[in-house]
Amino acid sequence: MKLEHDISVVHTTHPFVIARGGASDHRLIRVRIRDDDGVEGWGEAAPNRFYGETADTALAALARLAPIVEACDPWKLEEVETELNRALRFNGSVKSAISAALHDLIGKRLGVPVYRLWGLDPARAPLSSFTIAIAASDAELRERIAQAATYPVLKIKLGTDRDEQIIRTVRDAAPGKILRVDANAAWSPKHALRMIEVLVECGVEYVEQPVAAHDLDGMRFVRERSTLPVIADESCVVSTDIPRLVGVADGINIKLSKCGGLREALRMIAIARAHGMLVMAGCMIETSLGITAAAHFAPLLDYADFDGAALLADDPYRGATINGGAIAIPEGPGLGVTRR
């Protein structure tokens, strides 16, 4: 087999700003694994600096992992992910891209979509939220909410000195929508509790990562006093993080770019369920190639946030969609992703 890659720069329709900053352009890496007879599997890496990755470090990681991939038996999906993790502890986006490409390859070999490899029913996928990033003004915020009119579930990014004003504006502009909030680790525990009172008043469904990723005592403090479910995102990267989050958070947010592969994502779901926790999955800014890989396990989730490609002005792929919030998983073999 041969491991190849190419780099692309994609652009969001609006600057995607969260509590720790933002940008409009994003470098992504497409991974191609080509078997000896020409069958290809595709995957996508969306490196994120918060988790110690950039496009440059991702390329270096790919070079290091290439010998493992090119010598592997693609049918041994679990074994390959184990070998990748032994070779590199971090670089989750690169490992997840390789994992997705191998699943794509095997699905194409068998002529079935990846979700069928796992025995899943796509009709059981939850609605996806659509993210409203931090806007510069109330007028801009209302404009973005209007543009998201077809989405029944909105995820609101907070973590500013205007948070109460933002969430009240959103509720006023979208009185009938389900609202979820993501503070991206921006609040102190006590401020989180003050904000949760406002969120409850505004009918918010849950709050995601209210405090710093490392502050598990602070998150436990919030969770024990909160009337809203608390979901751990930045605090939950891989499956071994989950046991220490029991009693600290009500649920976890899985992202392929964090956890490093589809097998690991399935493992995280199983472990969280065993502990009675809620399970959601999210994304970085990704094209439909990256989003579709995660969408194949959407039927196992309580909540989904698969809007990464919907936020783009220039998505180069066709794959899973979230029209009206409903996740439509491709029926084609493998991931079912094609170029536009």
Task: Give names to the regions the model predicted.
Residues 309:
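Active-site cofactor/co-catalyst pockets and adjacent glycine-rich loops in catalytic enzymes
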Residues 106-109, 296-300:
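Alpha-helix C-terminal capping segments
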Residues 301-305:
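Short helix/strand-capping turn motifs
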